[in-house]
Regions:
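Secretory targeting signals
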Residues: 30-87, 91, 117-183, 219-236
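Transmembrane helix-loop junction
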Residues: 16, 95, 108, 139-143, ...
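Central hydrophobic cores of alpha-helical transmembrane segments
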Residues: 26-31, 184-196
Length: 254
């Protein structure tokens, strides 16, 4: 019975994401960066050279490689992608509080735990599908422009980036549960990500910050060994957001 109800809630989330165009927007974002990143890596040296041409300025720009395309994709997603994910996720629960959908559903025999779990899981699945689209697009265009390409290496980098974005989503959904409206939830999520970035520069404690995952993806590009601490820190953040999110929502009075 609970399994069937959970699947119904998941289906409701997917339907809502489609109707609200959140699914299309996130897919479009990853598709866009999947195309633009290899293009930027390939043609940026030529653009810079043409800009300084005739100005008696000499700039030595190394020839772009497929690693530059991957690095550009990671940079784009970890900056603009994070901002867009926060915007799309900040209303996950807060929006339904505002329009009364949450109150309507909870009048029925719907478990609050399953309600929140369906929110987290559906968002994670949406992110995974979007990442897959971005991954395949980068692979295609990098193959076209650079020829050689390490699929396994990029898969590892994409997995690290996915974990980082799951952290972003988890924090945003947590504040969406905590807050009454969307805007404060988004602001708090953004401030928390900034705080995690500041924590990452601290000594022994900072190495556990999820913000270090972006650095780990760059380390993998250069074929160096990665550190496990940011992964442990990310797992703790995700579990805490889900656990405390469920706990707070149990006490929410519709």
């Amino acid at each position: 019975m609970k399994t069937n109800l959970f699947l119904v809630l998941i289906n409701k989330e997917f339907t809502e994401q489609w109707r609200s165009s959140r699914l299309i927007i996130l897919l479009a974002v990853f598709l866009f960066f999947g195309i633009v990143s290899p293009l930027t890596a390939k043609f940026m040296p030529d653009i810079i050279s043409s800009m300084v041409k005739g100005q008696n300025i000499t700039i030595q720009i190394p020839e772009a490689t497929w690693k530059d395309a991957i690095g550009q994709f990671v940079k784009n997603i970890s900056q603009m992608g994070v901002f867009i994910i926060i915007l799309l996720s900040m209303g996950t629960v807060a929006r339904e509080k505002e329009n009364g959908t949450a109150s309507f559903l909870l009048v029925k025999p719907v478990s609050r735990n399953l309600f929140i779990l369906s929110k987290f899981l559906s968002q994670f699945i949406l992110l995974f599908v979007s990442m897959a689209v971005g991954f395949l697009t980068v692979v295609l265009y990098t193959k076209i422009f650079f020829g050689t390409f390490s699929m396994i290496l990029f898969a590892k980098i994409s997995l690290i980036l996915f974990i980082y974005l799951v952290v972003v989503q988890s924090i945003t959904i947590f504040f969406s549960i905590l807050m009454k409206t969307q805007i404060p939830a988004g602001i708090l999520a953004f401030m928390t990500m900034l705080l995690l970035g500041l924590v990452s520069i601290l000594g022994k404690t900072g190495v556990y910050s999820p913000s270090h995952l972006i650095e780990e993806s760059q380390i993998i590009i250069n074929d160096a060994a990665i550190n496990w601490q940011p992964f442990a820190g990310s797992l703790i953040v995700i579990i805490c957001c889900i656990s405390f999110g469920i706990r707070f929502f149990r006490n929410w009075e519709s």
